[in-house]
């Protein structure tokens, strides 16, 4: 659910990230790594659901690792450089790979503790929401729209408000203003000017690394 939801809401990939995003960053999205990666992810998720039906609650945890390990990678095949890193979740290769840890590597440490707390609240709410009702919507083929739109603050803000509304409908009373510091930090104002009753605001945008 988290993989698909993050994919369909690019604001979650970019709002909390560092300045280095894109295919050669430390935490590329699935659709930034290889062109066929999303298709392979859909097949992998289908296999996970089939195994869940087959094994039920007794499904071996290493099946998730073996199914996703070669998909959650960057362009070089590095399993650590991925938006969702499962290196330390449940790898059967070594004991250090079976720590039950899921790394969200696109999350940069924010400059204030309260910004970190509200991020944690967001993650807890999304996990709770998908625990009750798994996310099964089809993956969106963003194509070039991903970097054409979601490097800009207006599109990130609009998409993130959809996430807030989704959580509110699920019973979590989220307020988008809680994340105003994150927007100001990620897309700082360069300058503003008022002309004939019109206001022009110029902000920094993101730039993908290729």
Q: Where are the predicted features?
A:
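C-terminal accessory/tail domains of diverse enzymes
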Residues: 1-210
